[in-house]
Amino acid sequence: MLSEKFHLRLLTLLTLLTALSLTDVASESKLEKLLMKRVDRDVKPAAAVAVSPSKAKEFLTSLKRPKRNLWDRSRPDVQQWIQQFMYMGFDEARLETDLAYWMDQHRSSDQGRQHHYDENAALGPRGAASYRHGANVNYDYY
């Protein structure tokens, strides 16, 4: 009985090896076929696809970005602020400079965004005052 099982397993193994050896080894695998680039004859060369330099320059020069203001001048309250500021003797350039300064000052003093240390470092900050306790620690940008 043992020899019968042994012969059956041996026969199955030999059949499997024969089937594997008869398959065409030289043929490419499916992965290689997927990775190979198809060469199509109807693909245009890169020079035919590219736009002429004059057309490209014409397109790029037509794009003019409007000057970015820190406030919306169409709002009546903003217009009133500008008028009051100019009435005090300042010009609009000075107003824009001051607004940029104070907005930047506010951004830099925001403890949620200000980091004096690498928050992903293995060793935290040394000083107890520099460590920020609370819900905004390390979760500010998510």
Curated annotation (Swiss-Prot):
Look up the signal peptide feature and give its range. Answer: 1-28
Spell out where the chain crosses the membrane: none
Q: Name one GO biological process term.
A: cellular senescence
Cell compartment(s), UniProt: Secreted; Cytoplasm; Apical cell membrane
Concerning its family, UniProt says: Belongs to the augurin family.
Q: What is this protein's function per UniProt?
A: Probable hormone. Required for the proper formation of the central nervous system by attenuating cell proliferation during development.
How is this protein named in the record? Augurin-A
